[in-house]
């Protein structure tokens, strides 16, 4: 029986997130400039019932968050004569890099006034929290940044910040039940598509069954079946006699698909199995992923280890340092630390279920004001180079604020349009970073019995719109408990990355951005329902009956630019475009993961530290 799926959409995002949420503040911070010009200061305090994490439908870069910046790119200008407020520091971007910058700056200047501006209706940037209600139960998912990946690789300041915020990494060893699915006999499975394999077939037990048994069930030709078993079991060195360093140089510029085709010499069907394997990690197909990189991934990709000794991998530390909402909890801990009254509690456990009071974020008596729904459109050094004037748009109204210093913790590609006075060389360095589009769709199902019956916790699709359907990480922290048994609700993670067979390099990401912005919620929804039915229908799953809600986290500007693909250029350190782009520009400093060309939380933190040190010395 078909039922309506919850999907309160942000089609008119500014009406929902701004028009009904802005309430008058009880008091206001008046700049001295207001006495001069006699203008009335706008009020930005949000209502008590404002709560974006509970919204379903299109999230991520939701409608209302991107349109004004796109107008700026097309040449639109907003002229505001009067400076409404003054701050010691203004930060553009309320993601982890921007919030970390505020946190570190306050260590040196605890009494300074800080304003953080963000174009989204929630803070955290790509660290997005998704909440679902199922009766009295709450299920939480991550809509973006997933985990503290490899905490030992974090800069010292990041590990220190975690400690100060109360993040005790050792607790994850108990909180993350690593064997929950495996002890039920659940593992990895593959849905083979008809176009490439002649029939649509879901084969379970990848890595659990013998390779011979798995291959026997897979819809492969005799030659492909033989080659599949060989690539999984052979201990051949496909570059025998070549020195190790030379092997590394060769394979660093050899895509994994080419390695399978030219060195292992497998049937094309075997290549097709793995062509999209790491799509959610690298966001390109395996023709563009260096063979050296698949060893780091540690994701069941065969054939390399006996040719090239493994140097490092994600498995050097377990992948367990995960809050139920991903790294959104880091952003929430930062906000709780800096804005009194924004959250209750004091620990890493209670932050998971604490409800943010958004009415506290932008009060006039705050030392730090976090202003959402505010798209910055112009940033300029001014006042005889002693300050920075910033124009931003909120709803249909433009405002101007002044800061002694400014940190841009936004997308690199936006900065040349925000700061047209920059040199062409610096603009080119910033524009080099083409962010990578992707979509994280979260599906709340009322039970996961079909997954359990099929003994799969992760479904990989060789074809199809979504690359995977994966059960939530089994994490229990504080009062939040993971789904205990298959008859309980579960959040399923699905990932879509636009893929173009005839486009490579950054141009595929530009085209992908256009594509996902043009895709409706209904299309994202239908693909999710069709693919879950395809994989789980044989075990009794019915999408119309079993899906409770869908949240689509659409990120047209997702991962930071990756230079580590086979076509990546080799630069001297000082010639790297992102290094040139992040140089201090008067009183304007740059902090974001783009500035390190690395889509990681540790990069976001490191670049925040660098930008703050430029200010504090």
Where are the predicted features?
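N-terminal secretory signal peptides and thylakoid transit peptides that target proteins
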Residues: 1-21
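Conserved flavin/dinucleotide-binding core of flavoenzymes
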Residues: 40-78, 187, 444, 450-617
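Glycine-rich active-site loop/strand segments that organize a redox cofactor
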Residues: 46-48, 54, 125-156, 292-313
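N-terminal glycine-rich phosphate/pyrophosphate-binding loop and immediately adjacent elements
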Residues: 66, 73, 77-248
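Conserved beta-strand->loop/alpha-helix structural units within folded catalytic cores of enzymes
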Residues: 88-100, 117-120, 376, 405-412, ...
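Active-site/ligand-binding neighborhood in enzyme catalytic cores
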Residues: 233-374, 385
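Mid-domain catalytic core of redox enzymes
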Residues: 368, 372-493, 497, 503
């Amino acid at each position: 029986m078909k039922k309506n799926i919850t999907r309160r959409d942000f089609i008119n995002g500014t009406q929902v997130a701004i028009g009904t949420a802005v309430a008058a503040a009880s008091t206001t911070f008046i700049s001295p400039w207001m006495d001069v010009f006699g203008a009335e200061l706008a009020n930005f305090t949000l209502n008590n019932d404002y709560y974006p994490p509970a919204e379903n439908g299109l999230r991520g870069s939701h409608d209302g968050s991107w349109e004004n910046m796109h107008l700026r790119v097309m040449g639109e200008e907003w002229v505001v004569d009067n400076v409404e407020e003054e701050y010691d520091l203004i930060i553009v971007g309320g993601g982890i890099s921007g919030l970390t910058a505020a946190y570190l700056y306050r260590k040196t200047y605890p009494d300074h006034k800080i304003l953080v501006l963000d174009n989204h209706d929630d803070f955290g940037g790509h660290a997005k929290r998704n909440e679902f209600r199922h009766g009295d139960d709450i299920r939480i998912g991550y809509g973006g940044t997933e985990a503290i990946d490899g905490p030992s690789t974090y800069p010292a300041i990041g590990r220190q910040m975690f400690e100060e915020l109360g993040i005790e990494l050792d607790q994850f060893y108990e909180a993350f039940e690593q064997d929950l699915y495996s002890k039920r006999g659940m593992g990895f499975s593959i849905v083979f598509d008809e176009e490439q394999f002649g029939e649509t077939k879901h084969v379970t037990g990848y890595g659990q069954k013998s390779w011979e048994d798995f291959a026997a069930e897979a819809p492969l030709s005799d030659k492909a079946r033989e080659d599949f078993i060989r690539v999984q079991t052979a201990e051949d060195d496909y570059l025998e006699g070549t020195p190790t360093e030379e092997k590394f140089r060769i394979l660093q510029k050899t895509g994994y698909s080419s390695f399978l085709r030219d060195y292992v010499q497998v049937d094309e069907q075997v290549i097709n199995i793995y062509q999209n394997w790491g799509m959610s990690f690298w966001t390109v197909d395996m023709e563009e992923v260096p063979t050296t990189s698949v060893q780091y991934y540690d994701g069941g990709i065969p054939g390399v280890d006996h040719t090239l000794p493994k140097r490092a991998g994600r498995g050097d530390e377990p992948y367990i340092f995960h809050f139920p909402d991903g790294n959104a909890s880091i952003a929430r801990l930062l906000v709780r630390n800096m804005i009194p009254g924004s959250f209750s509690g004091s620990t890493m456990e209670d932050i998971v279920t604490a409800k943010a009071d958004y009415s506290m974020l932008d009060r006039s008596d705050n030392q730090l004001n976090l202003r959402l729904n505010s798209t910055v459109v112009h940033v300029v050094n001014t006042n005889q180079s002693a300050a920075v004037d910033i124009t931003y748009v909120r709803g249909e109204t433009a405002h101007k604020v002044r800061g002694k210093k400014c940190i841009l913790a936004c997308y690199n590609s936006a900065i040349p349009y925000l700061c047209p006075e920059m040199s062409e060389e610096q603009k080119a360095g910033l524009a080099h970073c083409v962010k990578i589009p992707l979509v994280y769709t979260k599906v709340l199902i009322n039970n996961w019995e079909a997954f359990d019956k099929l003994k799969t916790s992760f479904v990989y699709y060789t074809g199809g719109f979504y690359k995977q359907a994966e059960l939530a990480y089994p994490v229990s922290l504080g009062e939040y408990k993971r789904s205990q048994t298959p008859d309980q609700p579960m959040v399923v993670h699905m990932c879509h990355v636009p893929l173009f067979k005839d486009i490579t390099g950054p141009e595929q990401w530009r085209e992908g951005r256009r594509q996902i912005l043009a895709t409706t919620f209904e299309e994202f929804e239908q693909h999710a329902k069709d693919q879950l039915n395809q994989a789980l229908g044989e075990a009794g799953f019915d999408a119309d009956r079993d899906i409770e809600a869908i949240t689509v986290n659409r990120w047209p500007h997702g991962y930071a630019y990756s230079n580590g693909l086979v076509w990546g250029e080799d630069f001297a350190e000082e010639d790297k475009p992102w290094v040139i782009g992040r140089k201090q520009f008067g009183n304007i400093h740059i902090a974001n993961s783009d500035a390190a060309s690395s889509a990681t939380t540790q990069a976001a933190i490191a670049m925040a530290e660098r930008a703050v040190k430029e200010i504090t010395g």
